[in-house]
Amino acid sequence: MHDELIKRCYALARSAVAHGNHPFGALLWKDGQILMEAENTVVTQLDVTGHAEINLVRTASKRLDPETLIGASLYTSTEPCIMCQGAIYWAAIPRIVYGVAGSSLAELQGAAWYTPSRESYQRMGASIEVTGPVLEEEGMEIHRGFW
């Protein structure tokens, strides 16, 4: 199941690039169905907070009741950055599944921004289940082609 949903996130990441944005996509999953999807919109919306996970959490928080969020899983093409980790925490989404590890992307970009999700949530005392990487090489191909 994880593979299929991560592949959908990779399709969203490719769509984000086609729309002129950065290669990231995310979806919300519960009870065997995709509740909603989001892409990165940083470039087209001129908004540095327009990460796929933030866009997803922002929309989900407005449209779904808290009980739905509490029982959902967030799938994302790449491990969430620290900003997105915080949004997921505050939305009370208990599970994250990611494709590409943040450390792999940071290494590709030569960046030092990476904070592991598991480490962040442990420091917060949050019981958010983190699974990943899943199909990482497929996701890295998207990033290599972009960055």
Q: Model segments located where?
A:
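Active-site phosphate/pyrophosphate-handling residues
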Residues: 4, 33, 55
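A glycine-/small-polar-enriched, mobile loop at the entrance of the PLP active site in fold-type I
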Residues: 43-47
